[in-house]
């Protein structure tokens, strides 16, 4: 288990949410901060995608009705993350793969990070015996051109810096920063 006391670094503030949806979003935001901490510690790159990215850009947080978070990693970083995260997560979180949860059958998505203190039913999976806490989906990216990837990333960073925020040190979800000032590499 983790040697970092995430309960102090990123306290569980789910009860501060005024609605069930907001409580779920606060849980996922805490989970994302912990994922970010682990990724930074181990030099693992990731990026937000889908509605998560749209919410961060358009709403400076979650899309108001959004109930999930999605991130991507290139395959090499994804494989390292899966290997490392199992031992880094606090007790109230888990890495859900077919190896860590034999009842997990959400294919083709090979990995989720789950909150173990919550419960969510996904349509069509009510009878499954797998863990069912709130989750963050992690999508491994397999097809990319190695020589074009740095160029594409550089373009994304320029767009990000120009239109979204002044620095890649933090992404703000309302008043919550994903990149913690408390974190030291």
Role assignments for model-derived ranges:
Residues 1-4:
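Conserved oxyanion/phosphate-binding beta-strand-loop segments in alpha/beta enzyme cores
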Residues 6, 12-40, 85-146, 162-180, ...:
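Conserved catalytic core of two-metal-ion nucleotidyltransferases
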Residues 10, 47, 65, 139-140:
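Tryptophan-centered motif/residue detector
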Residues 36-69, 78-79:
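Active-site nucleotide-donor binding segment shared across nucleotidyl transfer reactions
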Residues 72-74:
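Short hydrophobic/aromatic beta-strand micro-patches
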Residues 80, 147-148:
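Intrinsically disordered, low-complexity acidic/polar segments
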Residues 148-154:
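A short secondary-structure junction signal
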Residues 154-157, 161:
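Generic detector of well-ordered alpha-helical segments enriched in charged/polar residues
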């Amino acid at each position: 288990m983790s040697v970092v006391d995430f309960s102090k670094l990123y306290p569980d503030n789910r009860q501060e949410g005024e609605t069930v949806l907001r409580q779920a979003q606060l849980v996922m935001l805490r989970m994302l901060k912990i994922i970010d901490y682990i990724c930074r510690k181990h030099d693992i790159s990731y990026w937000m995608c889908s509605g998560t990215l749209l919410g961060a850009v358009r709403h400076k947080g979650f899309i108001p009705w959004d109930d999930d978070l999605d991130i991507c990693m290139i395959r090499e970083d994804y494989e390292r993350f899966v290997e490392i995260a199992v031992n880094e997560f606090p007790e109230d979180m888990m890495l859900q793969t077919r190896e860590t949860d034999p009842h997990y059958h959400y294919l083709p998505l090979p990995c989720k990070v789950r909150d173990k203190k919550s419960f969510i039913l996904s349509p069509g999976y009510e009878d499954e015996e797998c863990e069912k806490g709130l989750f963050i989906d992690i999508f491994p990216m397999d097809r990319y051109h190695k020589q074009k990837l740095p160029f594409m990333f550089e373009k994304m960073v320029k767009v990000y810096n120009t239109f979204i925020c002044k620095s890649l040190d933090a992404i703000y979800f309302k008043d919550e920063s994903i990149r913690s000032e408390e974190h030291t590499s």
